[in-house]
């Protein structure tokens, strides 16, 4: 699907969609129980559908009533080697490898888009020496398929910390279910620590005990059972970051449903925008970011890489030079987001460059627009383009807009409600 985005002024109040990262985790905890759990504030997306399919393959069932999702946990006997369609969701894929080994003795995980090319060697190197059979192939329809067969055993597990925290979270879900005690150690430095904390918070709410013995080292008792824990899903700082950056660029937007008490690493968007010179007003779970005299800054993306593209746009329109550091993991997302961000900004008339794992931006006063952007197949690039267009002299065109369905299907409706123009 192709859309043209036009220069516009955005104004209004928006409720942040439910946190995708939190929803993944709460759904999995609910699916691993034997009871019923209600999650309120739930929002559909392609990634949520992927996690629901995988839980369904393990015997969970779902009922949707408005924004309430009722999950009935694993029922009956689990099929041997269930097939799990992960869509394009990296979280779903990496969470369910150890879960499936633990509760089903293996699985066939189907992957679409670029998901089949995203790194999985951390698990392969961990599980194959422990007797798990591992095979990467291609299905009859051309989709990548990962087949894992075997059983996880209690023991001492060590993971490198300079990889996606999704591998750590996958083990945290599975290890408590094993018939014996285990330890999990993550070697420092650790990527996206906040997402590990979010997983621990979710499993603890479901009655799982995890004992932290040292920094990034946990003792995990076995023979545990997940207990039903209904909750309301918090708003998503990762999605709200797009609107907060729009505020920093001169639009008048208030975002609601954003708790100041959160393990979401992408709350760092507020700190980073203030470092660029924006003003942040926060009260009663409402956030309004106002433009100031934006200036260059060095911003560390180590714990919040997903907000780097929209921050790069904001920094591009600030005075002076900015540097976004530790952006290397952007290369391993739905597209090479580091290269795509630099390409988009330059095509629009900015001055951006990649410097190793950093993005360097030389501020410009105005973006030209007037171009057709490539189809990146990435929801973050769609959001970036839509906000960039509001600050361009000429409209911009982009194909592949349907990629937005992966995380926030209602985004374009929200964008237009705020005054955004696209057709």
Regions found by a protein language model. Name each.
Residues 1-423:
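Short, structured segments at the rim of ligand-binding sites
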